[in-house]
Amino acid sequence: MPVRKQDTQRALHLLEEYRSKLSQTEDRQLRSSIERVISIFQSNLFQALIDIQEFYEVTLLDNPKCVDHSKQCEPVQPGNPWESGSLSSAAVTSESLPGGLSPPVEKYRYQDEEVLPSERISPQVPNEVLGPELVHVSEKSLSEIENVHGFVSHSHISPIKPTEAVPPSSPIVPVTPALPVPAESPVVLPSTPQANPPPVLVNTDSLETPTYVNGTDADYEYEEITLERGNSGLGFSIAGGTDNPHIGDDSSIFITKIITGGAAAQDGRLRVNDCILRVNEADVRDVTHSKAVEALKEAGSIVRLYVKRRKAFRKNHEIKLIKGPKGLGFSIAGGVGNQHIPGDNSIYVTKIIEGGAAHKDGKLQIGDKLLAVNSVCLEEVTHEEAVTALKNTSDFVYLKAAKPTSMYINDGYAPPDITNSSSQSVDNHVSPSSYLGQTPASPARYSPISKAVLGDDEITREPRKVVLHRGSTGLGFNIVGGEDGEGIFISFILAGGPADLSGELRKGDRIISVNSVDLRAASHEQAAAALKNAGQAVTIVAQYRPEEYSRFEAKIHDLRETMMNSSVSSGSGSLRTSQKRSLYVRALFDYDKTKDSGLPSQGLNFKFGDILHVINASDDEWWQARQVTPDGESDEVGVIPSKRRVEKKERARLKTVKFNSKTRGDKGEIPDDMGSKGLKHVTSNASDSESSYHEYGCSKGGQEEYVLSYEPVNQQEVNYTRPVIILGPMKDRVNDDLISEFPDKFGSCVPHTTRPKRDYEVDGRDYHFVTSREQMEKDIQEHKFIEAGQYNNHLYGTSVQSVRAVAEKGKHCILDVSGNAIKRLQIAQLYPISIFIKPKSMENIMEMNKRLTDEQARKTFERAVRLEQEFTEHFTAIVQGDTLEDIYNQVKQIIEEQSGPYIWVPAKEKL
């Protein structure tokens, strides 16, 4: 019997009667479920479905009404008419819908095997007694794991039952189970009528009433995410808990940071602001922060996370722009093969150019997703195709864009952002929160607007409380200040450290207090002691004061210039030559004689990497030297500052405690990270992103910080072609260009692995396949590998012998490794040509890689600074340039000059 409106009204009346009888406390959950079903019956969508059914039954199936003067319509046969029965039970399922409207479940299941549904459908939290069933295992291709990370991830995609979800194209909202059954959980449905609601999942898990943030269960979607713990953990950070609510009074455990390269980032489904409900079988709702951390630590190697997140709603809008002298006036990022947001091929607006057409119009905003330009669709296209479509437009351009929305409106903090720690040309990430929430009137927490876009006036200037949990590397930031009551400021945030992962501290913050210890008038030493002795959980009250910090920086800069240009009173004014000492050194800094007013006689200019023949080193303050060029020694003799003078002046300049600097030991020591326990942080492409930072703190026992000045060298003849290691921004482009332009001069070596050989692979061509893991671990401990890592429980590494094999064939072996590998090659008597690309500024980086946003350029610049600080003494040369072509030409020239057969290598003697 067909369902009519009067049947719906009768069912609604029965439900309301039944609800009125549920007055007991134990009936609360059932009452809530009934109220939700009642709201469904009263919704416009449900009424529209009834109208469609009546039209279907009365009009389309009535043959006489289908007759036309020109032709006769065939009657439409119902594929699956509504079953007979009373609606009093409200048993509406996807199988009980009209045949013409029921979702193509089997077809979608087939599609699900080919397309990861994580972006379209979020599976519900499964029943507690069921483990994850694997229907698809995501495995990266061989080419994608050539550069092995220590972070490992396999995506375990849980099955999506046919009655639990429908494709995005279907407007039908599945509702299950039949009511009234008290054991079932509330139905997840929109609480307000929607013209075209997205697919909604039915929550049939056994969780009790969940904790909500400014919304009801209908505002959320649920997902089970299975991660395989890598050697560096799960790759995300959390905040919240009953003892430290993250948002308002909500004690939920929130994801605050996705670490690039980690298990979560490679899986791609977990997002910032996701709320963790359960870790494996451990319920982490309404627990303390430490309990949540403990649950994650004890979860084992395979970790099932049950999360909820606010549903994403986007509002499409059309924009008409008139091209001006500056064109359309905005920049884009993203596209197939160049994802701006992990797992999303969409084209995003990353920059609005002041004075351009988009800026004048005011409707297009950073973070908007472009759907079409004129009649050209921009969904699932490459970056180049999108650029071409935008370029090939007339003066009048019609854009269709989706406005990203924010999750929380009434919060003034800037968002914690996802940063990419290995800056490549395709690194363009904005906060994944661009998926979520409502459009804010101003920049709000977890809005898609990155920190780089927010002006200083848009960041809260009020004091705020930040709780950090000290890691193995300390708190992860530097402080400066503390003289004459000027305050203590944060001058540097270490990428990947606790401060960076929290996302709540920034350069320019003034520290007001630490664990209730007032630091407003503290000296630098007092602030350092307070931070060092604060324990594991450190509560910091900070206030963003960029103007004060800028004035402080300017004062430090002026002081630095004064000190470097001043004459040191201890200098004798003339050289003492009673005991002449001659040696060859390599300069580890640039020196401009015009800026040194204390010179006793004519000075000698030099740059980093220059070889100097010191012909008189008897004076404590000044040496006499000649410059050594590829053509021989120069005739010009000049005065240079001695090692002692350089180090004394630099230590005076650096009279600050650096919480992220490591105390350098003897440079001749082998880095103690090549044992099997060290594999987790010895990765093959960490050169742009990772450095080995020890515990932050002051120098102990009066030990002075290592200062770069000169390195003693000897000339040596080599009978091999030197390996090449290029570090810094744009290194991958330079490496590729070298191999492409000179395939006969540059090559790569074959790595080793303990992974079993695949059918199409050839031993010695694709990999050197090692049958014994124990043997490879032993070789690693014996320093036979310059770098090694673990992926999917298999070891991968680059051996000294593989590099030597390429070198002995007369080719430069291009190595994509970290700075640590330079020292290991030197110990193996394979002296590499190591070149550091030093960016001039953030603007310089953005000019060479126009796809980067301001924030990404800043992060790239900071990584380059840390890289230079960590490995400067190992660099053969440092290059700078305004363009990539300029840098490439310098690199080629350096390689040609340093190829040998006579090269300068570090000497064993000390200065």
From Swiss-Prot:
Region feature (Required for interaction with MARCHF2): 224-545
| A GO cellular component entry from the record | perinuclear region of cytoplasm
In the record, the effect of residue 39 to A is given as:
No enrichment in postsynaptic density upon CaMK2 activation
**In this chain, where does the modification Phosphotyrosine occur?**
398
Q: How does it sit in the membrane?
A: Peripheral membrane protein
Q: Which GO terms describe its molecular function?
A: ionotropic glutamate receptor binding; kinase binding; kinesin binding; L27 domain binding; molecular adaptor activity; PDZ domain binding; phosphatase binding; potassium channel regulator activity
Q: Does the record carry Cytoplasm as a key word?
A: yes
| Region annotation (Disordered) ranges | 70-105, 419-443, 662-696
- InterPro entries named in the record: DLG1-4_PDZ_assoc (IPR019583), DLG1-like (IPR016313), DLG1_PEST_dom (IPR019590), GK/Ca_channel_bsu (IPR008145), Guanylate_kin-like_dom (IPR008144), Guanylate_kinase_CS (IPR020590), L27_1 (IPR015143), L27_dom (IPR004172)
Alphabetized, the UniProt keywords read:
Cell junction, Cell membrane, Cytoplasm, Endoplasmic reticulum, Membrane, Phosphoprotein, Repeat, SH3 domain, Synapse, Ubl conjugation
Q: Which GO terms are recorded in the biological process aspect for this UniProt protein?
A: actin filament organization; actin filament polymerization; amyloid precursor protein metabolic process; astral microtubule organization; bicellular tight junction assembly; branching involved in ureteric bud morphogenesis; cell adhesion; cell population proliferation
Q: Subunit info?
A: Homotetramer. Interacts (via guanylate kinase-like domain) with DLGAP1, DLGAP2, DLGAP3, DLGAP4 and MAP1A. Interacts (via guanylate kinase-like domain) with KIF13B. May interact with HTR2A. Interacts (via PDZ domains) with GRIA1. Interacts (via PDZ domains) with GRIN2A. Interacts (via PDZ domains) with KCND2 and KCND3. Interacts (via PDZ domains) with KCNA1, KCNA2, KCNA3 and KCNA4. Interacts (via PDZ domains) with ADGRA3. Interacts with KCNF1. Interacts with CAMK2. Interacts with cytoskeleton-associated protein EPB41. Interacts with cytoskeleton-associated protein EZR.
Reproduce the free-text note on domains from the UniProt record: The PDZ domains may also mediate association to membranes by binding to EPB41 and ADGRA2 together with the L27 domain that binds CASK and DLG2. The L27 domain may regulate DLG1 self-association. The N-terminal alternatively spliced region is capable of binding several SH3 domains and also moderates the level of protein oligomerization.
**Which PANTHER family does the protein's record reference?**
DISCS LARGE, DISKS LARGE HOMOLOG 1
Q: What is this protein called?
A: Disks large homolog 1
